[in-house]
Design a protein with these regions (language model features):
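Hydrophobic faces of well-ordered beta-strands that scaffold small-molecule active sites
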Residues: 40-45, 72-74, 96-101, 126-128, ...
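Conserved, mostly hydrophobic/aromatic
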Residues: 44, 64, 72, 89, ...
Length: 285
């Protein structure tokens, strides 16, 4: 670690401690919850870091590794090939677990190349980040479920698994039907899983994530751990109002393997990354 980065980490840790960020949650007392998140399961979804990645991809990965992150979810390559990113990941001792790939690619002729690229990255999941607005109806989500099953079969044949990442509108009830429930009910659990974004699930009025884990076991191998400020905006993990210990209590039943930090608009991406990592690494549930 060079002097500049050592100074950054030392200063940021001091700020986090002074603000109470990253301290052990009150619920995790000596007589309370004791389960930690495995260090290998704490990752960063790279959309959070898109601004520094655009100018210094490798340096950004290096700083994430120095903070303590073990894994990343790829979202935007910033002009790099999958092989380029894999080389930088190997050099910084980070592991990519997934990549976000647009719906039109996943259901089209670009799927084989996308699957090959995820193998190159070293990942295990291909993730559809959102659905087009034109599908925002029960009929549209049923169409998407059919496409997911087809793409999920191709993914399984290549040794990967297809996941879907939610936003708030996915949890809306249209004509008396929850759109997200359509995807859960009409996709094959052997072929399709879900990357549950905790902020958007809460923002969209979904059932508590812990309830989803119980109702749909082993369908949620990855999470986007994103916090909500009291005014509803985004917040560093641990600084907002979401009750992560309660959400994680049934995470094992949900099949959660990766807790990927995300903040859609951090004022300082590295300070946000540090504060969020510190909180998750100390969390007990």
């Amino acid at each position: 670690m060079n002097g500049t980065r050592r100074a950054f980490l030392g200063t940021a840790l001091g700020v986090a401690a002074a603000a109470g960020v990253g301290t052990i949650p009150a619920a995790a007392t000596e007589s309370g919850p004791s389960r930690p998140i495995p260090p290998s399961g704490i990752g960063m979804h790279l959309y959070t870091m898109r601004t520094p990645l655009a100018t210094d991809f490798r340096g950004t990965l290096e700083r994430l590794a120095e903070i303590g992150y073990a894994t990343v979810g790829v979202s935007g390559r910033h002009g790099n090939s999958a092989a380029d990113i894999r080389r930088m990941l190997d050099e910084t001792r980070l592991k990519a677990v997934l990549e976000h790939v647009a719906y039109d690619i996943v259901k089209g002729a670009g799927l084989p190349q996308a699957l090959e690229d995820i193998h190159t990255l070293g990942g295990k999941w291909i993730v559809v980040p959102s659905l087009p607005g034109s599908l925002h109806s029960p009929a549209g989500y049923r169409e998407a479920a059919r496409e997911f099953n087809k793409a999920g079969l191709a993914a399984r044949e290549s040794g990967l698994k297809l996941l879907y990442h939610n936003h708030g509108t996915d949890h809306q009830v249209v004509n008396g039907v929850s759109l997200y429930d359509i995807l859960l009910a009409e996709t094959d659990p052997e072929l399709v899983g879900f990357e549950l974004d905790l902020y958007w699930a809460a923002n969209g009025g979904a059932a508590a994530p812990g309830e989803l884990f119980v109702r749909h076991p082993r369908r949620f191998p990855a999470l986007h751990v994103k916090d909500m400020a009291p005014n509803g905006s985004f917040a560093d993990v641990g600084s907002g109002v979401l009750d992560f210990p309660a959400m994680f209590d049934t995470a094992r039943r949900g099949g959660v393997k990766q807790w990927l930090v995300e903040h859609d608009s951090p004022a300082d991406p590295f300070a946000s990354a540090l504060a969020s990592y510190t909180y998750l690494s100390r969390l007990r549930y």
